[in-house]
Curated annotation (Swiss-Prot):
Main location, first listed in the record: cytoplasm
Localization per record: Cytoplasm, Nucleoid
Pfam families: YbaB_DNA_bd
Residues that span the membrane, as ranges: none
GO cellular component: bacterial nucleoid; cytosol
Database matches in InterPro entries: YbaB-like_sf (IPR036894), YbaB/EbfC (IPR004401)
Keywords: Cytoplasm, DNA-binding
Spans annotated as Disordered: 87-109
Record-given protein name: Nucleoid-associated protein Spea_1509
GO function terms (MF aspect): DNA binding
Coiled coil: none
Amino acid sequence: MFGKGGMGNLMKQAQMMQDKMAKVQEEIARMEVTGEAGAGLVKVTMTGSHSVRKVDIDASLLEDDKEMLEDLIAAACNDAARRVEENQKEKMAEVTGGMQLPPGMKMPF
C-alpha cells in the first residue's frame, strides 16, 4: 500500500503536524481578545484559554439599572468567548491546511 519509506514519511509528517499543533495551542492560550456589548460600554478581555483578564464598564452604566449591567457583562463575556473560538479555528486551519476535522475531534490526537 505504501511505497518504500512511505509509512515512515507519513509518520514523520504526522509528528510534524502534531508539533505545529502544540505550538499553535500555546499561542492561542497566550492570546487575548476583547468582547464588547452595549456599543462598547462593557468590554471583557479574555485569554485564549477562556480566562477573563479584565472587565471594563463605562461609568455611565453605574448609574443605570443593575439588571441591564449584568446582561451587558454576560453579553460581553459571550462575545469574547465567541472571538476566542473564531481565533482558534483560524489558527488550527493554518496548521491543518484548511482540512476540516470532525466535530469534537481535538488535535493533537
